[in-house]
């Protein structure tokens, strides 16, 4: 109980708005670390690391790993700036992240390696529709949306 209270007080003491800039380490297709800050990319949901999907030819692949690799390629050692003002129940900063002027969250969805997370935001629905029409990333084959896969 004391641990939870301490954690809650720590989270409440954090600034309401946080900009974090630096080199990022990719955890998965929608989570990164910059310095001591764990960041969940706002408005998108990428496959979980152990999640599989199928290619257009029916071959099973680790789509969570592919989403992580896609985010790593987008970042490629560049400085990343993340802007956010909320934290999730795990204490992660919820943020839109940029390489220069480019929205990484949008790029992940536009390339088809993440979905618009409509439960929390409608910001990336157009990007998702474009990826779907162009059959990019996950849209080349068959997959279960990450939020459904987690509930199995």
What residue spans do the PLM features occupy?
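Small beta-barrel nucleic-acid-binding modules, primarily SNase/OB-fold domains
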Residues: 2-4, 12-152
């Amino acid at each position: 109980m004391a641990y939870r209270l301490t954690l809650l007080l720590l989270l409440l003491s954090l600034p309401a708005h946080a900009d974090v800039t630096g080199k990022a380490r990719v955890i998965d297709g929608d989570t990164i670390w910059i310095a001591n800050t764990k960041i969940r990319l706002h408005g998108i949901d990428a496959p979980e690391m152990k999640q599989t999907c199928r290619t257009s030819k029916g071959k099973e692949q680790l789509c969570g790993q592919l989403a992580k690799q896609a985010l790593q390629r987008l970042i490629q050692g560049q400085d990343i700036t993340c802007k956010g003002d909320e934290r999730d129940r795990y204490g992660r900063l919820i943020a839109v992240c940029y390489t220069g002027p480019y929205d990484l969250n949008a790029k992940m969805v536009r390339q088809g390696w993440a979905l618009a997370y409509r439960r929390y935001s409608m910001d990336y629905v157009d990007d998702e529709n474009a990826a779907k029409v162009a059959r990019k990333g996950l849209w080349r084959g068959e997959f279960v949306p990450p939020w459904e896969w987690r509930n199995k």
